[in-house]
Amino acid sequence: LHSLKKRFAGKIKSIIIDPPYYFKKTKSSDAFNYNSNFKLSTWLVFMKNRLDVAKEMLSDEGLCIIIIGEEGYAQLKLLADNILGGDKYIGTISWRKSDNQANIGEFAKVTDYILIYKKSSGKLNKLPLTDKARKEYRYSDENGYFRRQILLDKTRGKYNYELTTPTGKKLYGPWMKEKEEIERLDNLGKIYWTRGGQEQPYGKLYLQDSEGQIPNDFWDNSFGTNQRGAEEIRELFSGDRLFDFPKPERLIYNLIKISSEEGDLVLDFFMGSGTTVAVAHKMNRQYIGIEQMDYIETVAVERLKKVIDGEQGGISQDVAWSGGGSFIYAELM
């Protein structure tokens, strides 16, 4: 990471990392293929040293995204606030990481947390509309499908004036838009009038004009689960369970979607099974992946080769991936 700092300082649009988690209780086995038995102070120093460099590498529009478990979340949030800036904190996504839950112990933990920070002027992109959101566009006219936009709102409206309906009924607000704007939209055919006793105007928000929907702070298992991530690895490597908790391509796809555009540079310095770089490749992003463990050659590098050959797992069909491209693999001696 330090060897790349000078060349790529201020050039990274999206940093997405899934670092070793902190655990309060010692693990008998290395659940994450990293040292999972840090003392809290050691783990925080470990993270601080890397976040310091990460901040330097972000562009002014860049975003830093960190995936972490519940046990280390509070401490990492304080550390990241200190390094990246509490005023640069955008929010935390709670991600349902499991298809099911264990019914043993006292409390089932089925979510991980995704912290999002901006360097300076960075902002999140919108996500594609879900099937549920698309169903809201159930009205149609000659211009296409649309959903209704509330204009008469007695709670939030701030404009008071008289408006006459097509049948001559008088409405008095309060309105969400100024009278001149509603009249302009009506003249353009962009007002939907209900009929009957509840006659009132609504704006028309067309499906084809939608740029998507803003991200929210809870992502359910439609964004993928750890089980799905493990299945993707097994499908790539002849059924071998190489990682216990790899992130699914669907989750990383959405994180890359909200934090970058095509051609932008994505960095993951805890590359692990290579999910982030594989998804970045399929999404036409530039990327840098860093991994200190020996399995980089047998897992991440081999996975990228399969991506170039056109493998059809993960998000491939959703993005019409058919293969191609290249990458450079180098070892720091």
Model-derived features with residue positions:
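Hydrophobic/aromatic beta-strand patches that form the interior of the parallel beta-sheet core
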Residues: 93, 288-290, 328-330
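S-adenosyl-L-methionine
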Residues: 1-3, 305-333
